[in-house]
């Protein structure tokens, strides 16, 4: 009888355990962003702590992020509710694996970003979340030499060249500064700014006639560029020491200039070419996998993340800028206020033409960058014929694309399979 009583007790215990109400689990926010310990903690304590429900924020590298997501998708169910990742991460997924988010009623202030977030479909597959990018900055002394009628927030490449030429003539020194040093991010300028602005592509249009015009235009700008730019890597240094009055760089590499002498410098959008205002956004978004346990709860969290006050809290936590219209508070660092305004103007401009970060290249990302750096060194520094160099470098680029099988990314037209170098 003892044995029977014991079994009966176990059975009753199991039944009670099954019948007992289970506390709802926190919403799992599975992200590739804000991974450093300090940023992740700030996301939990400063961004998500005011949300009405519990959120389990879990940042991971791209590999583990993708592995768990794919496992849940294959299983047909899972615990991930909200995905946070870069545009390139989402573009590698099938749109069928994400919940359409058009009915959410929130989106970014940038029509361009919202179009990207549709991933080639008719509906939003992710909601733009936050952004970082590269911009222009200038010493306010240079403003007196702007070409007549030029709007610093809507410059063309021709106006930028004329401006640099005016400063050159007035000071007797070439004062445009470019991060062409060993650790400079020059390749991102060519991939995300020059090529989209002049060719409306990067890979397909690499050796096009429009690309020849792009390089010829950059050579004109180089004539008014401080020749020591081949040693420049963080343009904040040249702004502060006066070696350059007009510069291009990543927002983080301009920060010291604005924080140390905020009244001396101005930030503004990159210039536009014949094909629009090319710029390279590091665009992160939020999505919901089709296997999410509670889609409504996930949608509510995404809506919360797009609130202006949440976007500002995210900026403080991560250094990434808002994608919605917000008025930045005065207690932010001077660099954030100055560069944030320029980023917002650039991404929301009517002629914005984003050149996205290269995607799908794996370990050959460095080889891809080298194609553009080699082209710069041969054409601009070495004075070689543009057409000859592009035809030569085209072979190296084509080999990389075929070996990786990487499909095209914006602004190149989509491809089935490896992006062709036309």
Model-derived features: positions:
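Extracytoplasmic/periplasmic solute-binding protein
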Residues: 123-129, 134, 158-203, 210, ...
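Hinge/lid segment of periplasmic solute-binding proteins
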Residues: 86-135, 159-161, 266-268, 422
């Amino acid at each position: 009888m003892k044995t029977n009583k014991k079994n009966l007790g176990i059975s009753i215990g199991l039944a009670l355990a099954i019948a007992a109400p289970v506390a709802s689990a926190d919403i799992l926010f599975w992200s590739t962003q804000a991974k450093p310990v300090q940023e992740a903690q700030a996301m939990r304590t400063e961004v998500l702590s005011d949300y009405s429900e519990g959120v389990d924020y879990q940042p991971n590298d791209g590999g583990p992020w993708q592995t768990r997501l794919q496992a849940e998708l294959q299983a047909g169910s899972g615990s991930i509710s909200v995905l946070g990742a870069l545009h390139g991460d989402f573009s590698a997924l099938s749109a069928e694996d994400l919940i359409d988010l058009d009915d959410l009623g929130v989106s970014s202030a940038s029509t361009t970003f919202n179009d990207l977030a549709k991933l080639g479909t008719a509906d939003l597959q992710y909601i733009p979340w936050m952004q970082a990018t590269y911009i222009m900055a200038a010493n306010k002394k240079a403003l007196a030499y702007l070409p007549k009628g030029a709007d610093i927030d809507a410059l063309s490449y021709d106006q930028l060249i004329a401006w640099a030429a005016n400063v050159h003539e007035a000071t007797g020194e070439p004062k445009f500064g470019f991060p062409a040093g060993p650790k400079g991010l020059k390749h991102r300028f060519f991939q995300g700014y020059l090529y989209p602005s002049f060719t409306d592509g990067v890979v397909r249009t690499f050796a096009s006639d429009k690309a020849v015009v792009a390089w010829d235009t950059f050579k004109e700008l180089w004539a008014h560029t401080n020749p020591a730019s081949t040693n420049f890597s963080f343009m904040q240094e040249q702004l502060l020491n006066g070696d350059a009055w007009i510069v291009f760089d990543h927002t983080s590499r301009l920060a010291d200039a604005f924080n140390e002498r905020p009244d001396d410098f101005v930030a503004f959008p990159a210039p536009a070419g014949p094909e629009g205002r090319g710029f390279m956004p590091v665009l992160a978004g939020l999505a919901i996998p089709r296997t999410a346990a509670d889609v409504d709860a996930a949608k509510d969290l995404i809506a919360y993340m797009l609130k202006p006050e949440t976007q500002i809290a995210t900026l403080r936590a991560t250094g990434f800028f808002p994608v919605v219209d917000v008025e930045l508070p005065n207690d932010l660092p001077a660099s954030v206020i100055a560069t944030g305004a320029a980023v917002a103007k650039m991404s929301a401009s009517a002629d914005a033409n984003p050149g996205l970060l290269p995607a799908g290249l794996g370990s050959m990302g460095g080889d891809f960058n080298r194609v553009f750096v080699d082209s710069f060194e041969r054409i601009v520094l070495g004075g070689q014929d543009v057409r000859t160099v592009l035809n030569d470098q085209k072979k190296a680029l084509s080999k990389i694309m075929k070996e990786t099988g990487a499909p095209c990314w914006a602004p190149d037209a989509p491809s089935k399979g490896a992006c062709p170098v036309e």
